Design a protein with these regions (language model features):
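Single conserved hydrophobic/aromatic residue that forms the stacking wall/gate
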Residues: 165-174
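Active-site rim beta-loop-alpha module in soluble metabolic enzymes
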Residues: 134-166
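Metabolite-binding pocket within alpha/beta catalytic cores that recognizes anionic/polar moieties
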Residues: 2-129
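Polyanion-binding loop/helix "lid" in catalytic or ligand-binding cores
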Residues: 122-133, 159-161, 171
């Protein structure tokens, strides 16, 4: 039987969550360099949970400087099987006002200045992205959101861009 290990990639505010009682900070190195920051190991009831601040504690890494490969590899070294990524983003849709949580089921990567693969010159591999999210994780997120009485929407598409400002209104037609 597989024991799932959860990691959350998100903002630095989760370091201050009171429910995270037992805390251990882990330093890891990867073949792709160092991850964004130390990884927080904690427990939620009896389950291990890991947290990695995408931009580093203190928010010192801009989106274009995040070492995604090192972040994912570090979590893999810890035996993480499931990752939930939480982001504060803008929306071009009126029915997605500020504060509404979206459980995405698709994404579009419109970035252009970062490495997007673990497979470099020596390995050629094709990874299907037809269904990039896990129904099990989406269901677990939805249950937690319902318990917290947060306004949310199930299913949506996240579009990643290579700049730090919000997109133009015409971007909705891309």
């Amino acid at each position: 039987m597989t024991i799932n290990k959860l990691a959350i990639i998100g903002g630095s505010g989760l370091y201050d969550v009171e429910e995270f009682k037992d805390r251990e900070l882990i330093d890891l190195k990867t073949p792709w360099g160092e991850p964004s920051d130390q990884i927080l190991k904690t427990k939620d009831n009896t389950k291990e949970v890991y947290f990695l601040p995408r931009h580093g504690r203190g928010h010192f890494l801009s989106p274009s400087n995040i070492n995604f490969r090192a972040n994912i590899d570090a979590l893999k070294q810890l035996g993480v099987t499931d990752i939930v990524s939480v982001s504060a983003v803008g929306s071009l849709k009126e029915d997605l006002p500020p504060g509404k949580f979206v459980i995405v089921d698709q994404f579009i990567d419109r970035t252009f200045s970062r490495i997007k693969t673990f497979f470099d010159d020596e390995i050629v591999a094709h990874v299907s992205m037809a269904h990039p999210t896990s129904n099990g994780l989406m269901n677990a997120c939805e249950e937690a959101i319902k318990k917290s009485n947060i306004d949310y929407q199930r299913n949506g598409t996240y579009v990643a861009v290579s700049y730090t400002h919000l997109t133009l209104p015409t971007s909705q037609y891309v």
